[in-house]
Amino acid sequence: MGRSIFVNLGLLVVAFSLRGSEADCPSGWSSYDKYCYKVFDERKNWDEAESFCMEQKTGSHLASILSSEEGSYVANLAFKRVKHPSMWIGLSNIWNQCSWQWSDGSSLGYEAWVEGPDCVMMRLQPGFIDWYSVECKSTLPFTCKFLAKREDPAPE
């Protein structure tokens, strides 16, 4: 009995250490690559959602989507948690500078959207993800994202 508990405890420790090897995210946040994400199924306008994200964690903003793989990851998170078929992402032109920008300052390299009004939502459909620009005053669920603190590997 004692050995069984010790072995099970050891396996639990290994499982938790492997889970955190990608990014060191707080409880309730999910990791992908070097970022942490959290989907919120409450409806806010774009400005309120961005402010809410910034209050959650230092460096947190509405999610920037920098690749199709990241877009798929965020969409899969949202499918599990959001009842609405769309959600805010961090792309906008709210400062009317004739250039679209991510709220976290990331470069706009990857895009999957149709240009229109000032803020961008991700439309969630099984097997298909696209972006649409809509009025920033619309209220939608949203995803926050921040750069995770990585654990430095122990020296050998």
UniProtKB/Swiss-Prot annotation:
One of its GO terms (cellular component) is extracellular region. Pfam families: Lectin_C. Residues 32-145 form the C-type lectin domain. It is found in: Secreted. It comes from the Eukaryota. Disulfide bonds join 25-36, 53-144, 119-136. Keywords: Disulfide bond, Hemostasis impairing toxin, Lectin, Secreted, Signal, Toxin. Interferes with one step of hemostasis (modulation of platelet aggregation, or coagulation cascade, for example). This is Snaclec subunit B. It comes from Philodryas olfersii (Green snake).
